[in-house]
Amino acid sequence: GFPNDEVRYGFLNFLVPYYTDVTDDETGFHIAKFMRELSFGDVDAFMERLKVFFAGIPYELSNGTERHYQAVFYIVFTLMGQFVETEVRSARGRADAVVKTGDYIYVFEFKLNGSAEEALKQIDEKGYLIPYALEGRKLLKVGVNFSKEMRNVDKYIVIEE
């Protein structure tokens, strides 16, 4: 663990250049845009930015394992700050990421060489949206498939509940 958020975010900012070609001075710019897009409910723009982010990862930095892609997702989502929780435990499983904004709650599930449909099915079967049903915000589930071959997002599906 980290003694405080400042140390945690500093460490994660330090890691970004090792996993991507984003420089230290660009990190805040990217993260702010990610948050703005989700705050306005623009999942398509968010996912396109995520694709660009992944496309910038040099081939030699990508070892093609699911753990590598999870690490990059974790870094991006964690740098988004207090709006994001990763590996969110519920009664029947663990959602990969939950993003909360003023008007929206997004539950993300990621698959590597699976399908976006499988990811959505897991959200439904494990009841990942149930804990947020009474919060009064729009609930969106986002199933994302990541292609090991393409080393990027292959397909995503967004469904509003």
What are these regions (language model features)?
Residues 1-118, 125, 147, 151-161:
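Extended alpha-helical interface modules used as scaffolds for assembling large macromolecular complexes
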